[in-house]
Amino acid sequence: MSMNIGATAMSRSSQAYAVETCVPDAYHFSKAQSTGTRFIMMLTAVASGVFAGRVMHSTMSVEMALTGLFVVLAFVGGLLSTWSPCGYSSLSLLRPAGRYSLGAVTRWAPTFFTHAVGYAIGAVVLGGALGGISWLLFADVPLQYAVIGLATLAIGYGLHQFGFLKMPYPQRRAQVPHDARFRFRSSVIGLLYGFSLGMNYLTYVQTPMLYIVTGVALLSGGVKAGIAVIAVFNIGRCLPVAVNFLPVKDQSVQAWLARWQESAVEVDGFLLLAIASAALMLVML
């Protein structure tokens, strides 16, 4: 009887500890801009893209310009994925244990390393699969057709982000449980988290830039190119966790993310429209 009581007490204590150390979900975010403001931002994005496309067309090769535009879109798309439910929780779960100190950060460094390894594995698996499909089915698609198709899709999702068009948003509405840190060592959690997020479609999709990146990988022409495409996006997804090397409180990071939630969506839409417009100018001039 006493052993049962003791086990119950230990279980309750563990649950209480988990509740105390887990950061609650954020429900109050910054407000969206008015319809008029979003419309002006949309027009500005298109005009900026058209201007940038004309400038790049006269100063560099089309292939180099398109590569640069893609790298910007993919890397920033990875950064913007931090505003997903999994982005919030990864910054919270993958933190140094105890009070901030050089020793705590040093002991935590392997967790960041395994987290990055998980993202790398995800890029190899997802990018390799998409690149393989591209090699088999889409290797002969003309560059101009590919760019026009992906740019049109990007414009649609840019309008979606500004609230002027409804686009399909396929995703798996799942994330790693908040109590994950109590099941495995921190470095193991870092690896599992990195792989799950590095696969990109196993959890929530925060930015439709991922769909454009996926399309680029599908039209990349080979396995190596497909891996490189997803790797650029995953680098952007992985880097925000490095904020935990700094002496910042978890609550401060979560509050900052919540405060800029709507702005992240607007940046997302702006870049989709601007980069798509620039890409169209490059292949149509």
Curated annotation (Swiss-Prot):
It is a multi-pass membrane protein. Keywords: Cell membrane, Membrane, Transmembrane, Transmembrane helix. The keyword Transmembrane helix applies. One of its GO terms (cellular component) is plasma membrane. It is found in: Cell membrane. The keyword Transmembrane applies. Pathway: One-carbon metabolism; methylamine degradation. The chain crosses the membrane at residues 39-59, 60-80, 119-139, 145-165, 188-208, 212-232, 265-285. This is Methylamine utilization protein MauF. The lineage of its organism: Bacteria, Pseudomonadati, Pseudomonadota, Betaproteobacteria, Nitrosomonadales.
